[in-house]
């Protein structure tokens, strides 16, 4: 019935001293060394889907890297910093902190279509370095649009759904709601009921196709 927020950006990080510093260089390296890059993610979960879409966009072959289990952000940061895995994702603030101590290499960020270096800086409250540029800003045609939806039981009357949606749209103008989303580095936008349904259908179709291509879909 509505969209709570549009999700937020994730930093894509590599081990310190990695032979690639941005997405284009990562793409070239993977193509030249198929099967050698190790990506830490939640196998069968959201972050594997995220990286599958990224690697597919970079190389045309989502299976040209090795995906290994590494779920928590703490584990990802620790293992990337130690060089145990080559690539992972993490929050922008954590990437900033580890990068400042030269523990990781920041390749860029992946987030919703609305994400830019400028508005990400506004979200996290710091001036982000150019190394945090989004996939789109680096010329890579992929985004990670993961809306947080508000759902209602099946057969809920449209007038009730519309009323809930209107309340959510008004919330996007409330300062405490804005501040809360800023603290989580997530984007908000007022999306009407019809556009919300279309957004969910489009996102579902994309994820379904991606998961099916990975052989992870269970009927």
Regions found by a protein language model. Name each.
Residues 36, 40-129:
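Ligand-binding pocket segment of bilobal, Venus flytrap-like solute-binding proteins
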Residues 43-47, 139-142, 199:
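A generic short alpha-helical patch detector that favors 3-5-residue windows
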Residues 86, 141, 187:
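Residue-level detector of anion-binding/catalytic polar loops
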Residues 95-172, 202:
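C-terminal lobe and pocket-closing loops
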Residues 58-59, 102, 138, 184, ...:
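Residues at alpha-helix termini
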């Amino acid at each position: 019935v509505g969209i709570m927020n549009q999700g937020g950006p994730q930093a894509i990080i590599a081990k310190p001293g990695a032979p690639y510093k941005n997405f284009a260089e990562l793409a070239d390296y993977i193509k030249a060394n198929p099967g050698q890059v190790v990506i830490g993610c939640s196998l069968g979960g959201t972050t594997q889907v995220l990286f599958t879409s990224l690697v597919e966009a970079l190389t045309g072959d989502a299976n040209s890297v090795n995906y290994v289990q590494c779920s928590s952000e703490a584990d990802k940061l620790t293992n990337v910093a130690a060089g145990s895995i080559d690539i992972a994702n993490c929050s922008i603030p954590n990437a900033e902190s580890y990068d400042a101590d030269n523990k990781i290499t920041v390749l860029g960020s992946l987030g919703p279509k609305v994400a830019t270096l400028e508005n990400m800086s506004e979200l996290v409250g710091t001036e982000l370095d150019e190394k945090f540029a989004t996939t789109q800003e680096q010329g890579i045609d992929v985004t990670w649009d993961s809306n947080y939806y508000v759902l209602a039981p099946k057969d809920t009357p449209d007038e009730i759904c519309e009323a809930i949606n209107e309340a959510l749209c008004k919330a996007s103008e409330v300062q405490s709601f804005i501040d809360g989303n800023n603290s989580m580095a997530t984007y908000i936008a007022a999306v009407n009921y019809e556009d919300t349904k279309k957004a969910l259908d489009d996102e579902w179709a994309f994820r379904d196709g991606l998961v099916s291509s990975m052989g992870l879909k269970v009927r």
